[in-house]
C-alpha cells in the first residue's frame, strides 16, 4: 500500500491490524503489542512508574533518536564522513548517552527493577550507536545495560548476524 495512505506523515513503521486499522509510530506500536499480547509485564502497573516509563519513551523520541539514529543513518547508509556530518549530532548524541549513563549508574533498568518498554525503546539505536561514531566505552553503565537488555530479549547475537 502507499505509505501516505497509511500514515499521512509518510513515516515508517506502520502496522496494519487484522481488522484493517492502521497504527503508526514505533512506540505506539510497541505499546499496542505489549498490551494486546503477552507483554503486560513490560508496562509498570503503578501509575507513577508507568508515567516514568512513558517519560523515557518520550525522551527517546525527542532527545535520543534524532541524534543517534540520524547520525548512524547518515554514516552507515549515506556514507557521509565525519566532516560532512553536523557536529551537533555527535555532541547531542553524546549528551543523550551521558543522561543514560547517569540513570544507569544507579539502576539496572530505566524504570524499576526489571525491563520495561522504556528499555526496549532505548536499546534499539543505542546498541548500534557505534555505527554512528559513538564510542560506548565512554559510557560503561550504558554498555552493561545494552548487554543486559540484549540478553533479556535474546538478541545478543543479532549484531553479529547483521
Show which residues each predicted segment covers.
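GST-like domain detector, emphasizing the conserved glutathione-binding G-site
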Residues: 1-87, 91, 101
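Conserved residues at the C-terminal ends of beta-strands
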Residues: 18, 123, 161
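Short, flexible loop/turn segments with low-complexity composition
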Residues: 45, 157-162
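GST-like fold's C-terminal all-alpha helical module
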Residues: 57-154, 158
Amino acid at each position: 500500500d502507499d505509505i501516505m495512505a497509511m500514515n499521512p506523515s509518510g513515516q515508517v513503521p506502520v502496522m496494519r491490524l487484522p481488522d484493517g486499522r492502521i497504527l503508526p509510530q514505533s512506540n505506539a506500536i510497541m505499546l499496542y503489542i505489549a498490551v494486546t499480547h503477552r507483554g503486560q509485564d513490560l508496562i509498570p502497573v503503578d501509575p507513577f512508574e508507568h508515567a516514568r516509563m512513558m517519560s523515557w519513551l518520550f525522551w527517546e523520541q525527542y532527545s535520543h533518536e534524532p541524534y543517534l539514529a540520524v547520525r548512524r543513518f547518515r554514516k552507515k547508509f549515506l556514507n557521509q564522513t565525519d566532516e560532512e556530518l553536523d557536529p551537533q549530532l555527535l555532541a547531542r548524541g553524546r549528551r543523550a548517552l551521558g543522561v543514560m549513563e547517569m540513570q544507569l549508574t544507579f539502576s539496572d533498568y530505566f524504570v524499576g527493577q526489571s525491563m520495561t518498554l522504556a528499555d526496549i525503546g532505548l536499546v534499539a539505536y543505542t546498541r548500534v550507536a557505534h555505527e554512528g561514531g559513538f564510542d560506548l566505552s565512554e559510557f560503561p553503565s550504558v554498555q552493561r545495560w545494552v548487554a543486559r537488555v540484549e540478553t533479556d530479549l535474546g538478541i545478543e547475537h543479532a549484531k553479529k548476524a547483521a
